[in-house]
Amino acid sequence: MKAYHKVRMYRTDVQGVCDSLVYNSKDSCMTMYTDPILWNEGQQLLGEQIKIYMNDSTIDWAHIINQALTVEMKDSIHYNQVSGKEMKAYFINGDMRHIEVIGNVLTAFYPEEKDSTMTGFNCLEGSVLHLYMKDKKMEKGLFIGKSNGTMYPMDQIPPDKLRLPTFAWFDYVRPLNK
């Protein structure tokens, strides 16, 4: 199946937009081309190309290829952000549970206390990062190999550090219904 020009898709668990889409029933892979964006709950994923692998009627995993970015909105000012060359997002029962970020990894995120109070702002970089999700939010991250970064108190965050260079928030184009 092929769809062209201003493709929009909606399911309760995932939404997406792109210019064109190809679905291959042999390997149950849906490939999104040209400015693809995928949303799962509060997570936005984007890259140059997104491949979504299905298992029956649910998403098994997604491969975000080149200039990969995931963004989670905390509030209207604060966003958790991770970018890299590529990402692999793994789903269980329609919920994203694990993201593997590979190559030139940059992060900008707000660690939280148990009561959701933001404790500061953490900027890190490395080569491979594993993110783990719980209750539809980022729970923890683990860099593989060397990483470096800086933790800023909330009142001392440099304005130029608030957004990664590739930051984009496209909630205004997100399909909200069928």
Please identify what each model-predicted range represents.
Residues M1-K178:
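Mature-chain termini and adjacent capping regions
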